[in-house]
């Protein structure tokens, strides 16, 4: 069992997106300290394995400053719980210095994440038999200190 946060704002606009209402950066309710406190409270029980960050697009530059603070707080409070993140951006291209979404917060955000599922959803590559991803182009990667550490194995 996991706790999940769906963020608002996404520029990918993938055809067939399961959550297209979150493309709008103003969708939903503002993220507040109370929201963070609620997430931390929900993560407390031992049966909660970890936290998943989805969207929308967590790595949109507008989202990174708030999210890095949240992820660091989760990591500090619950070091035994894992953090997964879904992003349509590519780790080895867009999230590197000079990449499309690289900001002063990107590296620190990546350092908090254990498993990153990257790549846009591609409807033509949709495969319902895949676990934890919607299309075959998406990769499930383990991260260590913000760097690629191998492909995730079930």
What positions do the PLM features span?
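Flexible, gly/pro- and Lys/Arg-enriched active-site loops
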Residues: 103, 109-111, 119-138
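N-terminal pre-triad scaffold of radical SAM enzymes
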Residues: 1-13
């Amino acid at each position: 069992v996991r706790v999940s946060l769906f963020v608002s704002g996404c520029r990918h606009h993938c055809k067939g997106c399961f959550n297209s209402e979150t493309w709008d950066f103003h969708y939903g309710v503002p993220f507040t300290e109370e929201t963070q406190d609620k997430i931390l409270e929900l993560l407390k029980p031992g049966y909660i394995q970890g936290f998943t960050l989805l969207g929308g697009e967590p790595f949109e530059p507008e989202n990174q400053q708030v999210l890095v603070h949240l992820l660091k707080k989760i990591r500090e409070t619950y070091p035994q719980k894992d953090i997964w993140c879904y992003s349509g951006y590519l780790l080895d291209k867009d999230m590197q210095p000079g990449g499309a979404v690289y900001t002063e917060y990107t590296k620190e955000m990546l350092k908090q994440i254990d498993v990153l599922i990257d790549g846009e959803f591609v409807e033509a590559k949709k495969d319902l038999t895949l676990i934890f991803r919607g299309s075959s182009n998406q990769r499930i990667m383990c991260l260590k200190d913000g760097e690629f550490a191998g492909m995730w194995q079930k």
